[in-house]
Regions:
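ATP-dependent carboxylate-amine ligase
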Residues: 2-165
């Protein structure tokens, strides 16, 4: 991951957010379709000498058919999968996650996105790579018509700092 660490890219697109003292690395990516998620996970696999983890969700009021596909891609290409909320909009968040879990029944279901990031970061070991996917550069979480401040990169930095890794 050393070459990737020095790459200046587009915010929210394979954005390197944190290096952990234990040797793990964390990235944010906007991937929110099955193809995009597959591309990101496939691209990052060679950079994980340990496990490849992913935290992802599926947007509400959007293509419901892709939700199980997102889960399937995540479980096929990552070692550690957490399904979380990602702009549920007007839909019930737990139902959105349940549809993603159809494609990935062994994934962990952690609805609160900040908590999902906390859980994923706490699991990181030397050589692991974590991708937090779906929101990319977005600075809000849309729930029931309200946009609540939320930024994956900021949450990752907080989680790494609080975990002390």
């Amino acid at each position: 991951t050393r070459a990737l660490d020095n790459l200046e890219g587009v915010p929210g697109r394979l954005q390197h957010v944190a290096d952990c003292a234990n040797g793990a690395a964390v990235y944010v990516d906007y991937a929110h379709t099955p193809d995009a998620l597959a591309t990101v996970l496939t691209a990052m696999r060679p950079h994980a000498s340990g496990k490849l983890g992913v935290v992802f969700g599926c947007g509400g009021d959007r293509d419901k058919g892709k939700r199980p596909q997102m889960g399937q891609v995540a479980c096929e290409l990552a070692d550690d999968v957490i399904v979380t909320d990602d702009n549920p909009r007007s839909e019930e968040p737990s139902l959105i996650r349940a549809q993603a879990l159809v494609g990935c029944p062994d994934a962990d279901d952690v609805g609160d996105r900040a908590k999902a990031i906390d859980v994923a970061v706490a699991r990181l070991q030397a050589g692991d790579v974590l991708i937090v996917a779906g929101k990319g550069h977005e600075t809000g979480q849309t729930v029931k018509g309200e946009v609540r401040p939320f930024n994956d990169a900021d949450e990752i930095r907080r989680a790494v700092r609080e975990a002390g890794i």
